[in-house]
Amino acid sequence: MATNFLTKLFGSRNDRLLKQYRKTVVRINAMEPDYEKLSDEALRAKTQEFKERVAKGESLDDLLPEAFAVVREGSKRVMKMRHFDVQLLGGMALHYGKIAEMRTGEGKTLTATLPVYLNALSGNGVHVVTVNDYLANRDATWMAKLYNFLGLSVGINLPNMPREEKQAAYNSDITYGTNNEYGFDYLRDNMVYESGDRVQRVLNYAIVDEVDSILIDEARTPLIISGQAEDHTAMYVAMNKIVPNLVRQEGEADPRTGEGVTKPGDFTVDEKSHQVFLTDQGYEAAERLLGHAGMIAEGASLYDPANITLVHHLYAALRANNLYHRDQHYVVQNGEIVIVDEFTGRLMAGRRWSDGLHQAVEAKEGVTIQAENQTMASITFQNYFRLYGKLAGMTGTADTEAYEFQEIYGLETMVIPPNRPSKRDDQLDRVYKTTREKYEAAIRDIRECYERGQPVLVGTTSIENSEIIDELLNKENLPHQVLNAKQHEREADIVAQAGRPGMITIATNMAGRGTDIVLGGNIEKQVAAVEADESLSEAERQQRIEQMRADWKIEHDKVSALGGLRIIATERHESRRIDNQLRGRSGRQGDPGSSRFYLSLDDALMRIFAGDRVRAIMDRLKMPDGEAIEAGIVTRSIEGAQRKVEARNFDIRKQLLEYDDVSNDQRKVIYQQRNEILDASDLYEMITVMRDDVVSDLVRQYVPAESMEEQWDLAGLEKALESEWRIQLPLQSQVQSAHAITDEEILEKVLQAAREVFDAKVELIGRENFTQFQRAVLLQSFDTNWRDHLSALDYLRQGIHLRGYAQKQPKQEYKREAFELFRQLIDQVKTEVTRVLMTVQVQSREQVEQATEALEQRSAHSLEHMTYGAPSDGDIGGSVEDEPLELPEGARVGRNDPCPCGSGKKYKQCHGKLS
């Protein structure tokens, strides 16, 4: 209460910032008459003037009013659009590294031109980040007219572009691209063998469009570049034949009484955590089935150490068959499994689930099973975007996630007021007992809208649900358009005309982003088609355009009079923000509109989180079938359930980041070292330091520091030098012939001998040629060991939560052990590189060149396969894929015995619970 009182008294921080920014808006507006008088050439010359002032030390903040005024004037001349004052406010928020929340239809794309232009003046490049290639291409092509007019270059960064084109795109003043492609380019740049092969410049400033989608929805999805690992294709096929013979248990047993199971079965499905667990009965059934299939020996246990990989494949098959559904979580396209993004409904071509899940789904659908992959490089979007010197974002829905943006990224969210107040009527949810009743009510609403000519956008959470609505509308003979991941290519065309009178458009979440739904239809697309028609004379073209605009005005006014665009949603999403995005399609720029959610107690969110409470209310009210409950208390109850899910997902993302920060720090060290190796013209000193460290470590194993001669093992040292580096050094005879010799002198003799062997190779081949070979060896060693290190960190993370049972802090233990693994990695690189360079037999420059080329080709081959990782289904550190427990050979642990790890849990609930 005290906080609310103070906010009313002094205004919120958002209000105070807006008040401060409005003073700058007044200054920009005052400049407008002067800039209107400038010729096109004089206006363009301002860009060069600004660049020179920045080069002399003037700050971008000082230039802001003038730069914004120039962009506004340029837009008026080229785009025929003038930035509203609220767009200037949004541009300032973006320049100052904030997230600007601007409602749908407020012109975020045009708003971004202001800070993009200003920050491009520094010459360090600006990256505009979009959610898909279509938007990157559209926005770059659209806005390039303005930027080029003002003297700035624009590049588009798309997948599969040749390296030279990517370099040109990144060297432009402004680069448009997707979050995935920027991240992949960063990883690829840190895997190249020639410095000239890198494409990115310094990561200076990025504006992330639809920032909530990229930095929150995708935060748990790492970008992964991977190479093929061992093939287990036959195993996935075999497991897919076994799983259908297992029966799902209905009901959940109470841990105290054992009651609650309505139908016993072999496995349970936990929809909240998105996991599957074998029951005791299922464990025995699986053993029996695997025994019949000859996959485990007679009398052997499924949880014997030798069968741990079987358990992994069994659980992958169970999850594929019971948690992942066709046309909801994935589609089958051209004989491949393509993941459907749960937040946008878009197809994620090239992305694969990890941990064998994707292969299990491929086996289930009977398509070609592709080999599993080993991670070669990875980074989360959270850590990639934190590499930028300055980061900003814009979206229509950020306020509900403002705390997370501040906590994780240090980004403040600023709500920009609309140019015109919204007239949308967001009606209370209607909740029905069954799915059938819900759909019947939604169809009635759609029919009523259609009969009066009001356009309708029907929102669904999955392709499956959109196809159900599609069938129902076909039965009712109601003409409509379907927009889901299967019609991705037609997205813009369908959405552009969704505001025409009588239009019915069914859409998954993907329709929420990027394209405005204009009442009366998108006239600009139609005008563009006429302007491109070369068969028309100029007079005919103008006449036709004028007629089209007049017709559009009639349709626009008609739709407005009918209440604008009607949003009908058939399910609540887990996130309030996604629901708000759907609502936000209606009521743009002060247009009228309305929205209504039709729900049932069978919906996933209701069933898992809020169904019992609402069902109890319905039973108390003795509501007949077909009647809906429509009350604020129900809507608030549903939003409360959504808040719980959002809080849980935030905790998962935050925990992921805390663990990933450890590997992120190590990644920075490795990539910095890699870049130094690539950029160095001579590596002799670096190799010398490495070699001396390795030689010293070896010598000290046989001749400890400050030790007596009696403690030395010179015979062992001679043998080690011969076997490790082919150095023949008669240390024993030298010591015997000397009157007195110290351990330091022994060390110096060995170092000198190693130096002479190495220098002889360098002299034979030539320093420059040998530098190339050294570079290839160093990079190959770093890459191989980094790849193995990433796998080791994954295994460590999966089992680290067990330390909690020993009263240890898992995160601290993870940091400590990860550091030790990293130290071992560095030592291993030094040892490997020294061994290769000391033992390689070279007789000519040609041999060195061939060896260098072979190393580089091996690296290039490993880059051929690239894929996405998928988000973890369990909490980080609490994943059900625990670190396998090593048991003595032949040892067997009963399912209900205490786990040998010492956790105090039963084996089936601890290391026996593998997926």
Curated annotation (Swiss-Prot):
The keyword Disulfide bond does not apply. Its cofactor is Zn(2+). InterPro entries: Helicase_ATP-bd (IPR014001), Helicase_C-like (IPR001650), P-loop_NTPase (IPR027417), SEC_C_motif (IPR004027), SecA (IPR000185), SecA_CS (IPR020937), SecA_DEAD (IPR011115), SecA_motor_DEAD (IPR014018). ATP binds at residues 87, 105-109, 516. GO terms for cellular component: cell envelope Sec protein transport complex; cytosol; plasma membrane. Keywords: ATP-binding, Cell inner membrane, Cell membrane, Cytoplasm, Membrane, Metal-binding, Nucleotide-binding, Protein transport, Translocase, Translocation, Transport, Zinc. It is found in: Cell inner membrane; Cytoplasm. It catalyses: ATP + H2O + cellular proteinSide 1 = ADP + phosphate + cellular proteinSide 2. It is an enzyme of class 7 (translocase). The keyword Transport applies. One of its GO terms (biological process) is protein import. It is a peripheral membrane protein. Transmembrane segments: none annotated. Monomer and homodimer. Part of the essential Sec protein translocation apparatus which comprises SecA, SecYEG and auxiliary proteins SecDF-YajC and YidC. HAMAP family: SecA. Part of the Sec protein translocase complex. Interacts with the SecYEG preprotein conducting channel. Has a central role in coupling the hydrolysis of ATP to the transfer of proteins into and across the cell membrane, serving both as a receptor for the preprotein-SecB complex and as an ATP-driven molecular motor driving the stepwise translocation of polypeptide chains across the membrane. This is Protein translocase subunit SecA. It comes from Delftia acidovorans (strain DSM 14801 / SPH-1). The lineage of its organism: Bacteria, Pseudomonadati, Pseudomonadota, Betaproteobacteria, Burkholderiales.
